[in-house]
Amino acid sequence: MALKGYVANIEKLTEKNTDFRHVLYTGKHSQLVLMTLKAGEEIGMEVHDHVDQFFRFESGEGEVYIDGAKHKVKDGDCAIVPAGAQHNVVNTGKKELKLYTIYSPPEHVDKTVRHTKKDAEKMPEEYDGKPTE
């Protein structure tokens, strides 16, 4: 069976996204996820012991914390958090902070959608080993 992969205009999808977390595609070794943080909202301080994480910011303003170091971010910026680093993303602006993130390896169950941070906290999920294809 031929694998299809995933091809899309990620900027448009990220800008249209209103969900706190929306898993688009899960491969064997990486996962593409859209995120939107409301004004003043944050992902929450966390550590992924075995997962590297890439962030790309499409709109809004915020701060990324990586092992205690604070970095301001805006449209066009990116950040990479190495596995084992304590990190957080905070929306410091008055508008939504829109971003996509790539986990390597995957972190969430494929096709997971959590409309709000509260939903994500109530229904945490860990990757079950099943990729999109």
Language model region names:
Residues 69-83:
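Short acidic-glycine-tyrosine-enriched beta hairpin
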Residues 51-62:
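Glycine- and acidic-residue-biased ligand/ion/polar-headgroup-sensing regions
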Residues 28-30, 38-42, 61-63, 70, ...:
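Short, charged/polar surface micro-motifs in flexible loops or helix N-caps
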Residues 83-109:
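Ligand-binding loop in jelly-roll beta-barrel domains
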Residues 10-45, 51, 102:
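A short glycine-rich, His/Asp/Glu-containing loop-to-beta-strand
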Residues 1-29, 115-133:
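A short, N-terminal "cap"/entry segment at the start of jelly-roll beta-barrel domains
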